[in-house]
Protein backbone atom coordinates (compact mmCIF):
# COMPACT_ATOMS: atom_id res chain seq x y z
CA UNK A 1 0.00 0.00 0.00
CA UNK A 2 1.39 3.39 -0.93
CA UNK A 3 1.64 6.13 1.69
CA UNK A 4 -0.97 8.27 -0.05
CA UNK A 5 -3.51 5.41 -0.17
CA UNK A 6 -3.55 5.16 3.60
CA UNK A 7 -6.72 5.78 5.58
CA UNK A 8 -7.08 8.97 7.62
CA UNK A 9 -9.93 9.73 10.03
CA UNK A 10 -10.41 13.49 10.42
CA UNK A 11 -11.91 14.81 13.63
CA UNK A 12 -14.78 16.88 12.17
CA UNK A 13 -15.95 19.55 14.62
CA UNK A 14 -18.27 21.42 12.29
CA UNK A 15 -15.68 24.21 12.01
CA UNK A 16 -13.69 25.58 9.11
CA UNK A 17 -10.27 24.20 10.13
CA UNK A 18 -11.29 20.54 10.22
CA UNK A 19 -13.35 21.03 7.04
CA UNK A 20 -10.35 22.29 5.07
CA UNK A 21 -8.11 19.64 6.67
CA UNK A 22 -10.32 16.92 5.18
CA UNK A 23 -10.15 18.48 1.71
CA UNK A 24 -6.37 18.99 1.86
CA UNK A 25 -5.87 15.32 2.74
CA UNK A 26 -8.08 14.31 -0.18
CA UNK A 27 -5.87 16.38 -2.47
CA UNK A 28 -2.83 14.54 -1.09
CA UNK A 29 -4.38 11.21 -2.10
CA UNK A 30 -5.35 9.82 1.30
CA UNK A 31 -8.49 7.76 1.83
CA UNK A 32 -10.40 10.22 4.03
CA UNK A 33 -13.33 9.71 6.39
CA UNK A 34 -14.68 11.98 9.12
CA UNK A 35 -15.57 11.44 12.77
CA UNK A 36 -17.80 13.73 14.83
CA UNK A 37 -17.20 13.35 18.57
CA UNK A 38 -20.00 13.97 21.04
CA UNK A 39 -18.29 14.62 24.34
CA UNK A 40 -20.91 16.31 26.46
CA UNK A 41 -24.51 15.41 27.29
CA UNK A 42 -26.31 18.70 26.78
CA UNK A 43 -28.46 19.79 29.69
CA UNK A 44 -30.16 22.80 28.16
CA UNK A 45 -31.91 23.55 24.90
CA UNK A 46 -29.46 26.19 23.70
CA UNK A 47 -26.46 23.89 24.08
CA UNK A 48 -28.32 21.03 22.37
CA UNK A 49 -29.05 23.28 19.41
CA UNK A 50 -25.38 24.29 19.13
CA UNK A 51 -24.21 20.66 19.13
CA UNK A 52 -26.88 19.70 16.60
CA UNK A 53 -25.83 22.60 14.34
CA UNK A 54 -22.16 21.55 14.55
CA UNK A 55 -23.07 17.98 13.58
CA UNK A 56 -25.21 19.26 10.70
CA UNK A 57 -22.33 21.43 9.45
CA UNK A 58 -19.89 18.52 9.71
CA UNK A 59 -22.31 16.32 7.76
CA UNK A 60 -22.83 19.00 5.10
CA UNK A 61 -19.06 19.34 4.60
CA UNK A 62 -18.59 15.57 4.36
CA UNK A 63 -21.45 15.33 1.86
CA UNK A 64 -19.88 18.11 -0.21
CA UNK A 65 -16.48 16.38 -0.18
CA UNK A 66 -18.00 12.95 -0.77
CA UNK A 67 -16.66 11.33 2.39
CA UNK A 68 -18.32 9.23 5.07
CA UNK A 69 -18.98 10.77 8.51
CA UNK A 70 -18.94 8.54 11.58
CA UNK A 71 -20.14 9.64 15.02
CA UNK A 72 -19.02 8.50 18.46
CA UNK A 73 -20.01 9.39 22.01
CA UNK A 74 -17.08 10.04 24.36
CA UNK A 75 -19.18 11.78 27.04
CA UNK A 76 -18.29 9.23 29.74
CA UNK A 77 -14.57 9.48 28.97
CA UNK A 78 -14.78 13.27 28.99
CA UNK A 79 -16.58 13.37 32.33
CA UNK A 80 -14.26 10.87 34.03
CA UNK A 81 -10.91 11.93 32.57
CA UNK A 82 -11.30 15.65 31.96
CA UNK A 83 -14.24 17.29 33.67
CA UNK A 84 -13.88 15.78 37.15
CA UNK A 85 -10.22 16.85 37.30
CA UNK A 86 -11.22 20.28 35.97
CA UNK A 87 -13.68 20.68 38.88
CA UNK A 88 -11.19 19.36 41.45
CA UNK A 89 -8.58 21.89 40.34
CA UNK A 90 -11.03 24.79 40.60
CA UNK A 91 -12.16 23.57 44.01
CA UNK A 92 -8.51 23.63 45.13
CA UNK A 93 -8.20 27.26 44.06
CA UNK A 94 -6.14 26.60 40.95
CA UNK A 95 -6.96 27.58 37.35
CA UNK A 96 -6.76 24.52 35.08
CA UNK A 97 -6.66 24.45 31.29
CA UNK A 98 -9.28 21.90 30.20
CA UNK A 99 -8.35 22.16 26.51
CA UNK A 100 -4.92 20.65 27.21
CA UNK A 101 -6.43 17.77 29.19
CA UNK A 102 -9.10 17.29 26.53
CA UNK A 103 -6.48 16.95 23.82
CA UNK A 104 -4.53 14.49 25.95
CA UNK A 105 -7.43 12.27 27.02
CA UNK A 106 -9.99 12.63 24.22
CA UNK A 107 -8.64 13.84 20.87
CA UNK A 108 -5.30 12.04 20.95
CA UNK A 109 -6.21 9.05 23.13
CA UNK A 110 -9.89 8.02 22.91
CA UNK A 111 -10.21 9.30 19.32
CA UNK A 112 -6.87 7.85 18.23
CA UNK A 113 -7.70 4.42 19.71
CA UNK A 114 -11.24 4.39 18.26
CA UNK A 115 -10.03 5.44 14.81
CA UNK A 116 -7.32 2.78 14.71
CA UNK A 117 -9.19 -0.11 16.33
CA UNK A 118 -12.79 0.44 15.17
CA UNK A 119 -12.34 2.28 11.87
CA UNK A 120 -9.04 0.81 10.66
CA UNK A 121 -7.25 4.15 10.40
CA UNK A 122 -3.56 4.51 9.65
CA UNK A 123 -3.66 8.13 10.87
CA UNK A 124 -5.95 10.62 12.51
CA UNK A 125 -6.04 14.29 11.55
CA UNK A 126 -7.26 17.42 13.30
CA UNK A 127 -7.60 21.09 12.44
CA UNK A 128 -4.93 22.20 14.91
CA UNK A 129 -2.46 24.89 13.84
CA UNK A 130 0.71 22.89 14.50
CA UNK A 131 3.23 21.06 12.34
CA UNK A 132 5.16 17.81 12.70
CA UNK A 133 8.63 16.92 11.55
CA UNK A 134 10.51 13.64 11.81
CA UNK A 135 13.98 14.03 13.30
CA UNK A 136 16.30 11.15 14.25
CA UNK A 137 13.49 8.63 13.97
CA UNK A 138 11.09 10.55 16.23
CA UNK A 139 8.20 12.81 15.32
CA UNK A 140 8.55 16.34 16.69
CA UNK A 141 5.83 18.88 17.38
CA UNK A 142 6.45 22.27 15.75
CA UNK A 143 4.62 25.56 16.07
CA UNK A 144 2.00 26.29 13.43
CA UNK A 145 3.12 28.44 10.50
CA UNK A 146 0.54 31.09 11.49
CA UNK A 147 2.04 32.52 14.70
CA UNK A 148 -1.30 34.15 15.56
CA UNK A 149 -3.04 30.77 15.54
CA UNK A 150 -0.26 28.44 16.73
CA UNK A 151 -1.81 25.83 19.07
CA UNK A 152 1.28 23.87 20.11
CA UNK A 153 0.75 25.17 23.68
CA UNK A 154 -2.36 22.97 23.89
CA UNK A 155 -0.65 19.84 22.52
CA UNK A 156 2.50 19.60 24.64
CA UNK A 157 1.29 16.40 26.34
CA UNK A 158 1.49 14.41 23.11
CA UNK A 159 4.23 11.81 22.78
CA UNK A 160 6.30 11.40 19.64
CA UNK A 161 4.36 8.15 19.03
CA UNK A 162 1.02 10.00 19.05
CA UNK A 163 2.40 12.74 16.80
CA UNK A 164 3.64 10.08 14.35
CA UNK A 165 0.04 8.84 14.02
CA UNK A 166 -1.41 12.33 13.54
CA UNK A 167 -1.63 14.74 10.61
CA UNK A 168 -2.13 18.50 10.89
CA UNK A 169 -2.89 19.79 7.37
CA UNK A 170 -3.73 23.42 8.21
CA UNK A 171 -0.58 23.81 10.31
CA UNK A 172 1.28 24.71 7.12
CA UNK A 173 -1.21 27.50 6.30
CA UNK A 174 -2.32 30.84 7.70
CA UNK A 175 -5.91 31.26 8.84
CA UNK A 176 -6.98 33.61 6.00
CA UNK A 177 -5.76 31.00 3.50
CA UNK A 178 -7.88 28.35 5.22
CA UNK A 179 -11.01 30.50 5.04
CA UNK A 180 -10.29 31.31 1.37
CA UNK A 181 -10.05 27.60 0.51
CA UNK A 182 -13.36 26.95 2.29
CA UNK A 183 -15.03 29.83 0.44
CA UNK A 184 -13.69 28.67 -2.93
CA UNK A 185 -15.04 25.18 -2.22
CA UNK A 186 -18.42 26.56 -1.15
CA UNK A 187 -18.26 24.91 2.28
CA UNK A 188 -20.94 25.92 4.80
CA UNK A 189 -18.23 26.43 7.43
CA UNK A 190 -16.30 29.05 5.40
CA UNK A 191 -17.46 32.03 7.45
CA UNK A 192 -18.31 30.24 10.69
CA UNK A 193 -16.64 31.96 13.64
CA UNK A 194 -13.99 30.14 15.64
CA UNK A 195 -15.28 28.38 18.73
CA UNK A 196 -14.28 29.59 22.18
CA UNK A 197 -15.17 28.47 25.68
CA UNK A 198 -14.38 25.27 27.55
CA UNK A 199 -13.25 22.42 25.28
CA UNK A 200 -16.34 20.63 23.92
CA UNK A 201 -18.72 22.42 26.28
CA UNK A 202 -19.00 25.56 24.22
CA UNK A 203 -19.63 29.20 24.92
CA UNK A 204 -21.58 28.95 28.15
CA UNK A 205 -21.75 31.68 30.75
CA UNK A 206 -18.79 30.36 32.70
CA UNK A 207 -19.76 31.59 36.17
CA UNK A 208 -23.27 30.20 35.89
CA UNK A 209 -21.99 26.91 34.48
CA UNK A 210 -19.34 26.37 37.16
CA UNK A 211 -21.89 27.22 39.86
CA UNK A 212 -23.96 24.20 38.82
CA UNK A 213 -21.20 21.85 39.93
CA UNK A 214 -19.35 23.74 42.66
CA UNK A 215 -21.26 25.67 45.32
CA UNK A 216 -20.08 29.28 45.49
CA UNK A 217 -18.45 30.37 48.74
CA UNK A 218 -18.44 34.16 49.12
CA UNK A 219 -15.55 35.69 51.03
CA UNK A 220 -13.53 38.83 51.65
CA UNK A 221 -11.55 40.84 49.12
CA UNK A 222 -8.56 42.46 50.82
CA UNK A 223 -5.72 44.64 49.60
CA UNK A 224 -2.07 43.68 49.96
CA UNK A 225 -2.05 46.05 52.96
CA UNK A 226 -4.81 44.06 54.65
CA UNK A 227 -7.73 46.46 54.08
CA UNK A 228 -11.06 44.81 53.35
CA UNK A 229 -12.59 46.49 50.29
CA UNK A 230 -15.23 44.10 49.01
CA UNK A 231 -16.68 40.61 48.76
CA UNK A 232 -16.04 37.92 46.15
CA UNK A 233 -18.62 35.31 45.16
CA UNK A 234 -16.16 32.41 45.07
CA UNK A 235 -12.39 32.06 44.60
CA UNK A 236 -13.01 29.66 41.71
CA UNK A 237 -14.32 32.54 39.60
CA UNK A 238 -11.02 34.43 39.81
CA UNK A 239 -7.52 33.95 38.45
CA UNK A 240 -4.20 35.71 39.05
CA UNK A 241 -3.85 38.87 37.00
CA UNK A 242 -7.62 39.20 36.56
CA UNK A 243 -8.87 42.77 36.29
CA UNK A 244 -12.50 42.63 35.20
CA UNK A 245 -15.39 41.31 37.25
CA UNK A 246 -14.02 42.14 40.69
CA UNK A 247 -16.82 44.54 41.56
CA UNK A 248 -14.54 47.09 43.22
CA UNK A 249 -13.62 50.61 42.16
CA UNK A 250 -11.17 53.08 43.60
CA UNK A 251 -10.82 53.38 47.39
CA UNK A 252 -9.94 56.25 49.68
CA UNK A 253 -6.54 54.70 50.30
CA UNK A 254 -5.83 53.82 46.68
CA UNK A 255 -5.38 55.59 43.39
CA UNK A 256 -7.68 55.37 40.40
CA UNK A 257 -5.53 52.58 38.93
CA UNK A 258 -7.44 49.34 38.26
CA UNK A 259 -7.34 46.48 40.74
CA UNK A 260 -5.81 43.11 39.88
CA UNK A 261 -5.96 39.74 41.62
CA UNK A 262 -2.49 39.03 43.04
CA UNK A 263 -3.18 36.06 45.32
CA UNK A 264 -5.84 33.57 46.42
CA UNK A 265 -5.80 32.47 50.07
CA UNK A 266 -7.70 29.21 49.66
CA UNK A 267 -7.47 28.19 53.32
CA UNK A 268 -9.18 31.38 54.49
CA UNK A 269 -11.25 31.97 51.32
CA UNK A 270 -9.74 35.43 50.78
CA UNK A 271 -9.05 37.16 47.47
CA UNK A 272 -6.02 39.48 47.58
CA UNK A 273 -5.86 42.44 45.19
CA UNK A 274 -3.46 45.26 44.34
CA UNK A 275 -3.48 48.23 42.00
CA UNK A 276 -1.43 48.26 38.79
CA UNK A 277 -0.74 45.45 36.30
CA UNK A 278 2.94 45.40 37.27
CA UNK A 279 2.50 45.43 41.04
CA UNK A 280 5.42 43.53 42.65
CA UNK A 281 3.00 41.00 44.21
CA UNK A 282 1.86 40.05 40.71
CA UNK A 283 5.39 39.42 39.42
CA UNK A 284 7.32 36.14 39.52
CA UNK A 285 11.00 35.39 38.94
CA UNK A 286 10.23 31.78 38.10
CA UNK A 287 8.06 28.76 38.85
CA UNK A 288 8.03 25.14 39.93
CA UNK A 289 6.29 22.76 37.51
CA UNK A 290 5.22 19.14 37.95
CA UNK A 291 3.32 16.44 36.00
CA UNK A 292 5.90 16.80 33.27
CA UNK A 293 5.42 15.63 29.69
CA UNK A 294 8.34 15.67 27.26
CA UNK A 295 7.48 15.03 23.62
CA UNK A 296 10.50 12.79 23.05
CA UNK A 297 9.66 10.89 26.28
CA UNK A 298 13.27 11.12 27.41
CA UNK A 299 13.65 11.95 31.12
CA UNK A 300 15.03 15.43 31.67
CA UNK A 301 18.07 15.81 33.91
CA UNK A 302 20.48 18.65 34.58
CA UNK A 303 19.72 22.11 33.22
CA UNK A 304 18.86 23.67 29.87
CA UNK A 305 18.29 27.03 28.25
CA UNK A 306 15.07 27.44 26.28
CA UNK A 307 11.96 29.61 26.15
CA UNK A 308 8.67 29.11 27.97
CA UNK A 309 5.05 30.19 27.72
CA UNK A 310 3.04 30.26 30.95
CA UNK A 311 -0.22 30.95 29.09
CA UNK A 312 -1.55 30.80 25.55
CA UNK A 313 -0.61 33.63 23.16
CA UNK A 314 2.13 34.83 25.49
CA UNK A 315 5.41 36.01 23.98
CA UNK A 316 8.16 33.45 24.58
CA UNK A 317 10.12 34.05 27.80
CA UNK A 318 13.83 33.12 27.81
CA UNK A 319 14.55 30.94 30.85
CA UNK A 320 16.78 28.39 32.52
CA UNK A 321 15.22 25.04 33.46
CA UNK A 322 16.67 22.84 36.20
CA UNK A 323 15.54 19.31 37.07
CA UNK A 324 14.61 18.93 40.75
CA UNK A 325 13.59 15.27 40.53
CA UNK A 326 11.92 12.90 38.05
CA UNK A 327 8.69 14.91 37.88
CA UNK A 328 9.50 18.43 39.07
CA UNK A 329 11.51 21.27 37.55
CA UNK A 330 12.50 24.77 38.56
CA UNK A 331 12.20 27.46 35.91
CA UNK A 332 13.97 30.82 36.33
CA UNK A 333 12.97 33.60 33.94
CA UNK A 334 15.51 36.04 32.52
CA UNK A 335 13.10 38.87 33.46
CA UNK A 336 10.19 38.89 35.98
CA UNK A 337 6.83 37.79 34.54
CA UNK A 338 3.33 38.87 35.58
CA UNK A 339 0.41 36.62 36.51
CA UNK A 340 2.08 33.20 36.58
CA UNK A 341 -0.88 31.03 37.57
CA UNK A 342 -0.79 27.68 39.45
CA UNK A 343 -2.82 25.06 37.60
CA UNK A 344 -1.98 26.47 34.19
CA UNK A 345 0.69 24.90 31.98
CA UNK A 346 4.28 25.97 31.38
CA UNK A 347 5.26 24.90 27.86
CA UNK A 348 8.86 24.88 26.63
CA UNK A 349 10.34 25.56 23.21
CA UNK A 350 13.63 25.34 21.38
CA UNK A 351 13.00 27.64 18.43
CA UNK A 352 10.10 26.18 16.44
CA UNK A 353 10.13 22.87 18.33
CA UNK A 354 7.78 22.28 21.27
CA UNK A 355 9.79 20.30 23.82
CA UNK A 356 6.96 19.58 26.26
CA UNK A 357 5.78 21.11 29.51
CA UNK A 358 4.16 20.67 32.89
CA UNK A 359 1.58 22.01 35.31
CA UNK A 360 2.58 25.10 37.30
CA UNK A 361 2.69 23.94 40.93
CA UNK A 362 3.81 27.25 42.40
CA UNK A 363 5.19 30.57 41.30
CA UNK A 364 8.40 32.00 42.69
CA UNK A 365 7.51 35.54 43.79
CA UNK A 366 9.62 38.62 43.29
CA UNK A 367 11.72 39.13 46.45
CA UNK A 368 10.46 42.07 48.52
UniProtKB/Swiss-Prot annotation:
Region feature Interaction with tRNA, mapped onto this chain: 149-151, 311-312
Disulfide bridge map: 102-199
Gene3D superfamilies referenced in this protein's UniProt entry, alphabetically: Adenine nucleotide alpha hydrolases-like domains, HUPs, Translation factors
Compartments, as annotated in UniProt: Cytoplasm
Pfam families attached to this UniProt entry: tRNA_Me_trans (PF03054), tRNA_Me_trans_C (PF20258), tRNA_Me_trans_M (PF20259)
Function: Catalyzes the 2-thiolation of uridine at the wobble position (U34) of tRNA(Lys), tRNA(Glu) and tRNA(Gln), leading to the formation of s(2)U34, the first step of tRNA-mnm(5)s(2)U34 synthesis. Sulfur is provided by IscS, via a sulfur-relay system. Binds ATP and its substrate tRNAs.
Assembly with partners or alone: Interacts with TusE.
UniProt record similarity statement: Belongs to the MnmA/TRMU family.
Protein name: tRNA-specific 2-thiouridylase MnmA
Amino acid sequence: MSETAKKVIVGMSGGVDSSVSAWLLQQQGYQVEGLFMKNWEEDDGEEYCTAAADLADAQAVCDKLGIELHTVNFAAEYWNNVFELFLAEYKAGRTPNPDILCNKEIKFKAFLEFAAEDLGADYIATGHYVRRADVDGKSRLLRGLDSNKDQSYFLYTLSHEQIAQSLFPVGELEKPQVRKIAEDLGLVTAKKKDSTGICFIGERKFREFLGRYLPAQPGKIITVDGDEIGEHQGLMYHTLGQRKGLGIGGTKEGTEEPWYVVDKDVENNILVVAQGHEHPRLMSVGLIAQQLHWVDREPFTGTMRCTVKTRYRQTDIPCTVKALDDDRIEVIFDEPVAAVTPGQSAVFYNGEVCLGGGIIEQRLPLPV
